[in-house]
């Protein structure tokens, strides 16, 4: 199994520090606003990485934090005239609502920065004692800064050089800093800001120290995987490495994994461009499974271009999978006829290779795009096989095994786990179709009667009536089923 390590800038054989045990830390959100599709991508990527490692038999300890104190939280609280705690709690709750709908399994440990102030103070004090950090007087309290030039390996993750960073730095306002690159470990409190007592007086932690303190506490001084979005490589992850390795004298994380951006019209999402897409707004018009599939349809390191037509394509693909499962379930109910026989060596070989091929793709740096392609090719072939009307015992048994394989592979990606009927029920709601399921069933019953009485005009009229509302009818030998039309 190979993973791309941002630290070494190459694909490497994945060898955990402790054989089958894997420690993973992913940087979570700053809880000051609703999550956007970029947060969704990072959450889905690391959710699948954890699921796949567990599928492979690794014992994973997954830690994902909340930054619940930050300038953005304070600014939002001041703007709304409420406490910073209220803002943090409100948006932590909103985060869970979105993530639950996206099918994100909660991390084993989800620490909050404000619950780890003592651990941060201990690291900062050690860094001062070792000469890696220094204090700056701020009235009655002090701020503490990390001295970047004391850590010669600074820039090893982002491949940036200290001298180039210094010469490219903007005009530094604070002359008291030894270098424009030095970053805050502890900030002396300003009037009206939250604060904690510390050896440097009242203040609060800098952003970077929070993740170092929490990851070291729960995963140890050196652990396997540290991850997050590519936007965190510099300065956040670079600063984490510097302060953590200066503190422990040991390597921090063995593998650094970063997911690519979500772009809109080839531009990175940003509030200044006004192109930020909230998860909540998207889940108002699309099923969460379609959004999840869209995010997994590209390799996690590549940028992914958002467009509504791509989500619609993903929705149509999810629909095809559930329709296939529904078809298989219809064949499970048919009367066995062992006289007819269909040649199905090709599709049988595809089933035998399905899991090995899926694993081969996922073992190659979690290539979900390739893995999904393999699954969809198999589903296409299964439908061709069903077009031939299989009816022998061995053929139906094969279809049952195929369905089980689709579900098992889907479970690693948390896709295709619903009953097909629930997929359509949920689409009724998300598409805001102005007809209730009871009414659909009543009209189907009415149409069945009309067909029995050979009243084809009425039967066609009911079909058209439902179609105009976005409901498609499919007549089966023993019944009529309904589906939601995918645009």
From Swiss-Prot:
Binds 1 zinc ion per subunit. Its cofactor is Zn(2+). It comes from the Bacteria. It is found in: Cytoplasm. Its main location: cytoplasm. CDD domains: CysRS_core. A motif ('KMSKS' region) lies at residues 268-272. NCBIfam families: cysS. Zn(2+) binds at residues 27, 211, 236, 240. ATP binds at residue 271. InterPro entries: Cys-tRNA-ligase, Cys-tRNA-synt_Ia_DALR, Cys-tRNA/MSH_ligase, CysS_C, Rossmann-like_a/b/a_fold, tRNA-synt_1_cat_dom, tRNAsynth_Ia_anticodon-bd. GO terms for cellular component: cytoplasm; cytosol. Monomer. Its EC number is 6.1.1.16. It is an enzyme of class 6 (ligase). This is Cysteine--tRNA ligase. The lineage of its organism: Bacteria, Pseudomonadati, Nitrospirota, Thermodesulfovibrionia, Thermodesulfovibrionales. It catalyses: tRNA(Cys) + L-cysteine + ATP = L-cysteinyl-tRNA(Cys) + AMP + diphosphate.
């Amino acid at each position: 199994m190979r993973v791309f390590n941002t630290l070494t800038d190459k694909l490497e054989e994945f060898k955990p520090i402790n054989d089958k045990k894997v420690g993973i830390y992913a940087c979570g959100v700053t809880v000051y606003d609703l999550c956007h599709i970029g947060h969704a991508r990072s959450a889905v990527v690391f959710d699948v990485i954890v699921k796949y490692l567990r599928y492979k038999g690794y014992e994973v300890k997954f830690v994902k934090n909340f930054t619940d104190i930050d300038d953005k939280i304070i600014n939002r609280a001041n703007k709304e005239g409420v406490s910073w705690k209220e803002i943090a709690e409100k948006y932590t709750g909103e985060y869970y609502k979105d993530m639950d709908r996206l099918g994100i399994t909660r991390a084993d440990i989800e620490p909050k920065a404000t619950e780890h102030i003592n651990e941060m103070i201990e690291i900062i004090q050690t860094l001062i004692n070792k000469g890696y950090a220094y204090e700056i007087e701020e009235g009655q309290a002090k701020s503490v800064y990390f001295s970047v030039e004391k850590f010669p390996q600074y820039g090893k993750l982002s491949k940036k050089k200290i001298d180039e960073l210094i010469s490219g730095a903007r005009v530094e306002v604070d002359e008291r800093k030894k270098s424009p690159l030095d970053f805050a470990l502890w900030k002396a409190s300003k009037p009206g800001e939250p604060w904690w007592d510390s050896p440097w007086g009242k203040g609060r932690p800098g952003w970077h120290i929070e993740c170092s303190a929490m990851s070291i506490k729960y995963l140890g001084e050196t652990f396997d995987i540290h991850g997050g979005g590519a936007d965190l490589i510099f300065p956040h992850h670079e600063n984490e490495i510097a302060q953590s390795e200066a503190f422990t004298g040991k390597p921090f994380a063995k593998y650094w994994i970063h997911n690519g951006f979500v772009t809109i019209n080839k531009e990175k999402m940003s509030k200044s461009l006004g192109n930020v897409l909230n998860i909540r707004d998207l889940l108002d018009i699309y099923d969460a499974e379609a959004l999840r599939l869209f995010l997994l349809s590209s390799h996690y390191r590549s940028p992914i271009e958002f467009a509504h037509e791509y989500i619609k394509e993903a929705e149509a693909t999810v629909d095809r999978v559930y329709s296939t499962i529904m078809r298989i379930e219809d064949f499970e109910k048919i009367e066995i006829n062992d006289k007819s026989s269909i040649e199905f060596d090709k599709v049988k070989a595809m089933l035998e290779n399905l899991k090995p091929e899926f694993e081969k793709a996922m073992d190659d740096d979690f290539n979900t795009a390739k893995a999904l392609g393999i699954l969809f090719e198999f589903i296409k072939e299964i439908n061709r096989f069903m077009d031939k009307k299989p009816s022998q015992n061995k053929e139906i048994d094969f279809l049952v095994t195929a369905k089980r394989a689709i579900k098992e592979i889907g479970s690693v990606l948390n896709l295709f786990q619903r009953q097909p009927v629930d997929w359509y029920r949920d689409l009724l709601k998300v598409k805001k179709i102005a007809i209730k399921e009871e009414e659909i069933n009543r009209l189907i019953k009415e149409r069945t009667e009309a067909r029995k009485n050979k009243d084809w005009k009425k039967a066609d009229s009911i079909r058209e009536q439902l179609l105009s509302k976005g409901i498609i009818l499919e007549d089966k030998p023993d019944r009529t089923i309904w589906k939601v039309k995918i645009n």
